[in-house]
Amino acid sequence: MMTKKALGLMIGALLSGALIGGEAAAGQTLADFHSKMGGCASCHGTNAVTAASVPDDERALNAQCQTCHGSYKDIRKTGTEIDPHHSHLGDINCTSCHTAHARPKLVCNDCHTFPNKMPFADAPEATPKAAPDEAAIEAAMKAEPRESYDVVVIGAGSAGFNAAIAARRAGASVLLLEKHSFSGGNSMLAAGGYNAVGTKQQKAKGINDTVEAYVEDTLKGGRGKNDRALVEILAKESAAGVEWLEGMGADLSEVKRSGGARVDRTHRPTGGETVGPHIIKTLRAQAEKDGVPARLNSRAVRLLVDENHTVRGVVVEGRHSGLYRVNAKAVVLAAGGYGQNKEMVAFYRPTFKGMTSSNNVTSTGDGVRMALEAGASMTDIDWIQAHPTVGKGSRILISETVRGVGAVMVNETGARFVNELTTRDRASDAILKQPGRHAWLVFDADLYAKAKMVRGYDHLGMLKKADTIEGLAEAAGMDPKVLEKTLTDYNAYRAKGHDDAFGRPDMPLAVAKAPFYAVEVAPGIHHTMGGVAVTTESEVLDIQSRPMPGLYAAGEVTGGVHGFNRLGGNAVADTVVFGRRAGEHAAKYALEQK
């Protein structure tokens, strides 16, 4: 009997063409290939297959893939070559990339530009699926519900996962919807950390921090435009949120400082692991354990609202199942912001029209649109934050942690021009005033060893590298004498403990140990500050500022928490603190209904 490993090796050889005399036939799809090895049953099992019979989340299909090919751990490469089977996205569905009946798509290339060496890359492209028309949505709204739950959560990023887990633990039946082929949302790309005050980590390091200081820093960063009541909850419950995640197995043991904070309060995994993927991996696993896995490929398209303005459920569009109605006693909107919706960005913030975005492709404003259609009120909806350090010419966010750990920011001549740890809006404004509207982050071997994400940027070919400052300046097109003086002055400021030039409050590392590195950056859309207006209990407000019964919201889809400008580390805290609150209050409301 052939073992699974042997069968996987054989199929791998077939896919490479080694056993069939060359490349796959032109236009052949993955499904065509598998049909020669057992027909539809080789992927779908023995049941009759129709488009509607394939589960939208495709979990069974992916289990079948692993039966033959093994798990990601079995097939990923261990060398330095970029391997999509070993990425920050985690162990996502095989079908996220390997579409069976059309040309495969490397989802990494939503952000990157890796060469596509996937099997069947010359298969016909899939026909884009048309958006459901109004008549079809209306028909689904009037149809009998396919399912009913106490709570439906829309969006499986950090806010959505936290809401779903909290609601389930409160005793509610829960459905977690995710429109993409894998979960994580914008949270998957979070690279800085989680701001929290009063944690055991701060106490162990002797960091003197207070709730009042956290609130003041956040209000100052937001230029006083924040909803103070929401900020106070964020600060007061931030430490409990860290403990909540740690109880699921998360590591947030390292504490650093982000821009706009007076002390170290940004918690992240030890060893420089990126915080977003780490938290999402933790939440995915916990949701599975708690019985609320994300239903993937399932887009919420319309909230169901009765004549009393009470939310009663949602219309869902499944990849395979089409439109259907789900009844719910409460709905939590956790669908993220609109940073990838160019039309919405141009409408709400015309000056940002055409600007690149660091956001996940899922950040298209679905939650804002559905809330508006349902009669919800918005707050600060036209406020958008540009992150100062997006990789120039890319969509890759260069984490604030790089500056926090010690990188120096210079312009194209090699001169410093700003306090690297100022707030994001001020840093972005300063960069846009420089020649070429771009800048460079410069650092040395010590920072390269300390901040793990920097090695990821190197892996992607984003870094300039040299054994001398002069060589680095030449590689980056700077004036060697200017850069040499800039770093000499900076190291002297660090040695005496005061930045005479720009007042940088924290200078953890010198830039003195070869090799030296630089990465080119420019501002890009990073966070939509405004959104759905909510109460302190995460209830969505209508246009008369009254809570809409049965509708809750958390995360970037909401407004009010961050004001005009968000501090680095506050978004992750926001998703955890208010995701939990939304789930708990939605469950409480739902369980009180008849």
Where are these regions (language model features)?
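Short sequence/structural segments immediately N-terminal
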Residues: 22-139, 148
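Conserved N-terminal/central alpha/beta ligand/cofactor-binding core
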Residues: 140, 173, 179-293, 297-302, ...
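Beta1/beta-strand and adjacent pyrophosphate-binding region of the FAD-binding site
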Residues: 143-159, 175
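A glycine-rich dinucleotide-binding beta-alpha-beta segment and adjacent secondary-structure elements
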Residues: 302, 482-565
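Glycine-rich loop(s) and the adjacent beta-strand/alpha-helix scaffold that form part
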Residues: 321-322, 326-390, 578-581
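An anion/pyrophosphate-binding glycine-rich loop and adjacent beta-alpha core
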Residues: 368-370, 374-482
